[in-house]
Structure formats: structure tokens, C-alpha cells
Amino acid sequence: MRIPQIQALRAFAALLVVIYHAKITSGGYIGVDIFYVISGYLITGLLLRELEKTGTISLRAFYLRRVKRLLPTSFFVLFVTAISAWYLYPSTMRSELGRDIAAAGVYISNYLFAFWQMDYQNLNAMPPVVIHYWSLAVEEQFYIFWPFIIYFLYKRGGKRLVGRGIAAISVLS
């Protein structure tokens, strides 16, 4: 089901990210935040509908849907990037290339780049070819934990506690 208003928000978010990377304006992170809000809204709704209908969440079905939707394209891009960068990057950077692609492949690149203090504002040299995977890593980590949080809150107090829990998490973050 495609909701036109959400599609418009996605387009706006993508535009913010593109104009940021084109160095037209700052604030591209707002586009990423919009993508996160959209994902959170859609996934929460999906999980709550399943809970109301069945009384549980099929984690297997949930994660299989995420895998089918995200991994083929993500891994294809990583593969093409790895092959291309192997030939285009200096040989002195190949160990970092392998490390960065491996971290992106298991969706922990946000932690790796934070550890090495690599971000878009702090790049003195050639940036990691997969630096953009930090946002996918955050989203995948959300997908890992969110169903458990929603299930726990729903079973303890229904939609009302879910709403309060989301509000509390929002304030704390």
C-alpha cells in the first residue's frame, strides 16, 4: 500500500539529502531523520496491526520481509562498490576498504565510523566508500530491537503504553 503523503515526504527527504551532498545547503541530516520517522511510523503500525489481529508478532515473517526488501540491493551495491574500489583506491587503503565493507555488510558501520571519528564533516582524506551505510546500519539496528520493544509494551498495557513508551524513547533520544 502506497500512501501518497508518505511518498511525498520520502521525496522531500531524498531532496534534502541530495542538496546537502551537492553542497548547496547544510542540514541534509534532516532528510535522514525524516526517513527514520517514516520507517518508524510504518513499522510500528505494521507491528501493532499484527498484534491486534493475532496477539503476537511473527519475528520470522517480520525479519524475512526486511531481508527480502533490503538485503538484495544492499549487498549488490556493496559487491559493486568493493570491486570498483579495489581497482580505484590506492593499494594502501585496501585494508580499510575490506574493514569498511565488512562493517557495512553486517550493519555496524555506524559504530565503526563513530569509533574512527569519521563523518561527513570530519573527513580529511578520501572518505570511506561506504560511509553512507551508517544510516542503513541505524535503520537495521532499529528493525532488530523495535519488534521486541513494541511487543513488550503492548502486552503490558496495550496501545496506550506503546504510545507512552514511544514518547519516552523520543524524549530520551
Model-derived features: where do they sit?
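Membrane-interface helix/loop caps of multi-pass membrane proteins
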Residues: 1-173
